[in-house]
Design a protein with these regions (language model features):
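Beta-propeller blade signature
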Residues: 57-70, 156-162, 238-249
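Conserved beta-strand positions in repeat-built beta-propeller and related beta-rich domains
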Residues: 4-9, 43-58, 98-103, 145-152, ...
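Repeated scaffold domains used in trafficking and secretory/extracellular systems
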Residues: 28-38, 83-90, 128-136, 175-182, ...
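Short loop/turn segments that connect beta-strands within beta-propeller blades
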Residues: 16-19, 68-72, 109-113, 161-165, ...
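Loop/turn-rich, solvent-exposed surfaces of beta-rich toroidal or solenoidal domains
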Residues: 175-245
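Asp-box/WD-like beta-propeller blade repeats and closely related beta-sheet repeat scaffolds
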Residues: 73-92, 99-107, 114-132
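Surface loop/turn motifs at the tips and blade-to-blade linkers of beta-strand repeat domains
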Residues: 23-28, 77-82, 117-129, 169-175, ...
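Blade-level signature of beta-propeller repeat domains, shared across WD40, Kelch, NHL, RCC1
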Residues: 238-287
């Protein structure tokens, strides 16, 4: 299986059979969210002059890089306003959804028009990194948005009806959390409790990984969780990371070590049924 990986410095592929790691794109980091349609792959690139993990530089002008099935860069998508501190992105309902944590907003792009959605009802929370919205997920036509909350309070999953975005409930889960998914029990939400180095669930399950976990692929047989060495933001581009492979009983099978590329931000598996991704299969990579 081929995993797409974003890090501080690079967009990478990892062949889980041969363990071969390849650089697909570099020099536009920090790279973060990965998503795909049936025909294209989208990657969020913050396009900074260095790959430091800033909390949204005032002059940051992030772009969405678009690749084909051969992982060739075909175009770049830019917005008519700054895309700052992009985190996870999602292709859903023929729209590209982009979390922009620095401005406390989610951007929605249908290919023609841009919409800026501010989930917080407080006007004072707009254009300030209050909730640090960082992860998106959809299941059963319900939209889920994760607020990291920067350690000021526990992280929270916001569950919305779609398409009216009417809030159904909030679920506190973890600290400085990333990623959202469920397994067999649709009421048991999982997330990476990044502050405590664990995967946790809303029913109390805990799986220790160590480091700072984020980035998830969930297939029928195996779970892949990314984690990076813990460091201050200005030093995160120098750390090592790894992807830990589990079976579906959460027993570790192996770990793939990644060095020289900084922290790991996201992982995806195009063409593979991945329940942690809004489009569960999507484009298939070709040679």
């Amino acid at each position: 299986m081929i995993l797409l990986i974003t890090t501080s410095k690079s967009l990478l592929t990892l062949d889980t059979e041969t363990e071969k790691l390849s650089v697909i794109h570099t020099a536009m980091g920090l790279y973060y969210g990965i998503t795909f349609s049936e025909t294209e792959i989208f990657v969020a690139a913050r396009n900074n002059d260095n790959p430091f993990d800033y909390l949204g530089k005032p002059d940051e002008q992030g772009v969405i890089l678009v690749f084909n099935a051969q992982l060739q860069l075909t175009r770049k998508i830019t917005a008519p306003f700054p895309l700052r501190d992009m985190h996870q992105i999602m292709f859903f309902d023929n729209k590209l959804w982009i979390t922009c944590s620095a401005d406390n907003m989610v951007v929605i792009y249908d290919g023609n028009e841009w919409q800026q959605w501010y989930p917080s009802p407080k006007l004072a929370d707009r254009n300030s990194d209050i909730n640090h919205f960082n992860s998106l997920w959809v299941k059963n036509n319900e939209l889920h948005l994760l607020a990291h909350n920067l350690g000021r309070e526990p992280s929270v999953i916001y569950r919305y009806n779609y398409p009216d975005k009417k809030l159904i409930e909030t679920i506190a889960l973890g600290n400085q959390a990333h990623n959202i998914w469920t397994l067999d029990n649709p009421q048991e939400y999982f997330s990476c409790d990044s502050d405590n180095g664990k995967v946790i669930s809303s029913t109390g399950k805990k799986v220790a990984l160590g480091g700072f976990p984020r980035g998830v692929v969930i297939t029928e047989a195996h779970y892949y969780i990314g984690t990076s060495d813990v460091a201050e933001r200005a030093e995160r581009d120098q750390v090592s990371s790894k992807i830990v492979q589990f079976n579906n009983d959460w027993h570790q099978i192996k770990a793939f070590t990644i060095t020289g590329h900084g922290q790991l931000l996201d992982i995806k598996a195009p063409g593979i049924n991945d329940i942690a991704q809004a489009i569960h299969k999507g484009i298939k990579l070709t040679d």
